Amino acid sequence: MTQAATRPTAEIGNEDILAVARRQVLEGGQGLSRDQVLQVLRLPDDRLDDLLALAHEVRMRWCGPEVEVEGIISLKTGGCPEDCHFCSQSGLFASPVRSARLDIPSLVEAAKQTAKSGATEFCIVAAVRGPDERLLAQVAAGIEAVRNEVEINIACSLGMLTAEQVEQLAEMGVHRYNHNLETARSFFPNVVTTHTWEERWDTLSMVRDAGMEVCCGGILGMGETLEQRAEFAAELAELGPDEVPLNFLNPRPGTPFGDLEVMPATEALKSVAAFRLALPRTMLRFAGGREITLGDLGAKKGILGGINAVIVGNYLTTLGRPAESDLELLDDLQMPLKGLNASL
């Protein structure tokens, strides 16, 4: 059953939405509906601190104090045939990113460094529509090599999959599969035209049926309306993923979204809290774009406003916060790292 299955959808009337959320989400464990999330997103900025405090209470009650740390690595960079308008790895745009592949020894070394940071999850990513036989063989070899030398969970993000490929990855022992819906179904055609939102959903359904954990989130600040952001939260709640990574658009030169403005920090924090109230039991991960959108102070507020997982180090084509900075912040906030056994 997804977190949206039994939630009410009626309007609340004149009752304060945070009072409703305290009763419904914090005390009752039921995520907010689409209409309720929209009310949260429309709250004035002077309610932000109250909103973040409630989202933190919800996270602590339904997820606990632990924070999961993950590192990611690009096995194949650039040259992607898809036209995701935010992505500098598309071969269709005049971006500075060039196609490259990582060798297995470098992959193993990256996994070792990730584990040293305290991370329990190592995600192997490839810029493709979906994996071909050559890439799957390389992934299989990489997973085996990492397993021989590093104690860490292995996740993959390899685009859209066939049923056979899903089974192959499950047999390789992939712990979690990431495939982001990216945005609301109604806004998706403004972001991608070379495949559909439904194709992504189908891959996620097969991943769940195969017994792997589902990781699915998206990018906020791509021009979607608040209504569409609330729609996206409700769609994720219907899917019921184990993890939702929240990215914020970091406009990349040469892409169709390269000239968009960065989301205001207050709007980003409000969105983090709203997604926590829609998904009270889900792992909510700070992902790409938080550095440019929120800065150091915003990162702290986000972790105290519903976030319970982070990506440490760099992202696929952009720089992230140093792992030490995130780990020091978590230590200062007295938030323990999730151990490997708890992640298995």
From Swiss-Prot:
[4Fe-4S] cluster binds at residues 80, 84, 87. Binds 1 [4Fe-4S] cluster. The cluster is coordinated with 3 cysteines and an exchangeable S-adenosyl-L-methionine. It catalyses: (4R,5S)-dethiobiotin + (sulfur carrier)-SH + 2 reduced [2Fe-2S]-[ferredoxin] + 2 S-adenosyl-L-methionine = (sulfur carrier)-H + biotin + 2 5'-deoxyadenosine + 2 L-methionine + 2 oxidized [2Fe-2S]-[ferredoxin]. Its cofactor is [4Fe-4S] cluster; [2Fe-2S] cluster. It comes from the Bacteria. Belongs to the radical SAM superfamily. Biotin synthase family. Residues 65-290 form the Radical SAM core domain. Catalyzes the conversion of dethiobiotin (DTB) to biotin by the insertion of a sulfur atom into dethiobiotin via a radical-based mechanism. It is an enzyme of class 2 (transferase). The lineage of its organism: Bacteria, Bacillati, Actinomycetota, Actinomycetes, Mycobacteriales. Its EC number is 2.8.1.6. Pathway: Cofactor biosynthesis; biotin biosynthesis; biotin from 7,8-diaminononanoate: step 2/2. Homodimer. It comes from Mycolicibacterium paratuberculosis (strain ATCC BAA-968 / K-10). NCBIfam families: bioB. Keywords: 2Fe-2S, 4Fe-4S, Biotin biosynthesis, Iron, Iron-sulfur, Metal-binding, S-adenosyl-L-methionine, Transferase. GO terms for molecular function: 2 iron, 2 sulfur cluster binding; 4 iron, 4 sulfur cluster binding; biotin synthase activity; iron ion binding. [2Fe-2S] cluster binds at residues 123, 156, 215, 285. This is Biotin synthase. One of its GO terms (biological process) is biotin biosynthetic process.
